[in-house]
Amino acid sequence: MAITAAMVKELREKTGAGMLDCKKALVEADGDMNAAIDFLREKGIAKAAAKGDRIAAEGLTAVAVNGNKAALVEINSETDFVAKNERFQSLVQNIADAVLRNGSETAEAALASEYEAGKTIDTYISEEASTIGEKISLRRVALFTKEDNAAFGSYLHMGGRIGSVVVVEGTTDETVAKDIAMHIAAARPLYVDRSSVTEEEKAREEKVLTEQALNEGKPANIVEKMIAGRMNKFYEEICLVDQTFVKDPDFKVGKYVESKGGKIVSFVRFEVGEGMEKREENFAEEVMNQLKK
């Protein structure tokens, strides 16, 4: 497979490795980006790539809750200038409310659903985009349900740049649930617990850690123990219940929730623009573009 400059640039942005190392890794991996990242990690050239890659696009998240149902949405705009606009902020909350009301489980279903009589959410967004003067898109949605003996926790950070919702069963204490939602926003967990991690991801991490240990020249009889210890650290980084609780470092999140009589069932964390590229534009240009519209 031909290795392009764009591929080298992408790998460099994800790993921080040099251009020559990135090109060599892509050649070795026959253009497979994930395999190239693993190659660089095995050689000790790069750290694990962040799951979210670069945080790029602008916009906001919003949460809507009604009884035993909740919704989390992400709406993207082209510029931060528009994301701070009150009309855009109202649009984001209105869409969250509509998604919850309609029970839409995907962005595609949400766009086709009714916003108000005779108007879909897609049409509503198009009309508002025309007024605001910028492309606006509904990127993703998440729906949640709970039983009467459970609690929702939700949190919006940085005015909605990050949004999180968690379902905690066994307790109706919304303060506990909100504290966990705040932790999720700060600590970026990927899974609830170890059983949620895919076998593919476990095997991939074990392979990388094994190669790292062998490249460090460790004896084979020590490598196995090293891998076990490093896998535990890996789980503590990505599994919510294994993370050290931000609000009380004496607790792991799972143990803290257990001490309150609860158990974490599910969560979702949206950060605006995860994995999306942002056009290069400065604030002054943003203002000028708005004035021209």
From Swiss-Prot:
Record-linked InterPro entries: EF-Ts_dimer_sf, Transl_elong_EFTs/EF1B, Transl_elong_EFTs/EF1B_dimer, Transl_elong_Ts_CS, UBA-like_sf
Single GO term (MF): translation elongation factor activity
UniProt region (Involved in Mg(2+) ion dislocation from EF-Tu), positions on chain: 79-82
GO terms under cellular component: cytoplasm
Subcellular location: Cytoplasm
Keyword Zinc assigned: no
Superkingdom of this protein's organism: Bacteria
UniProt keyword Oxidoreductase, yes or no: no
Keyword field: Cytoplasm, Elongation factor, Protein biosynthesis
Family: Belongs to the EF-Ts family.
Classification via HAMAP family: EF_Ts (MF_00050)
Purpose of the protein: Associates with the EF-Tu.GDP complex and induces the exchange of GDP to GTP. It remains bound to the aminoacyl-tRNA.EF-Tu.GTP complex up to the GTP hydrolysis stage on the ribosome.
Protein name: Elongation factor Ts
Annotated source species: Exiguobacterium sibiricum (strain DSM 17290 / CCUG 55495 / CIP 109462 / JCM 13490 / 255-15)
Lineage, opening ranks: Bacteria, Bacillati, Bacillota, Bacilli, Bacillales
Gene that this polypeptide is encoded by: tsf
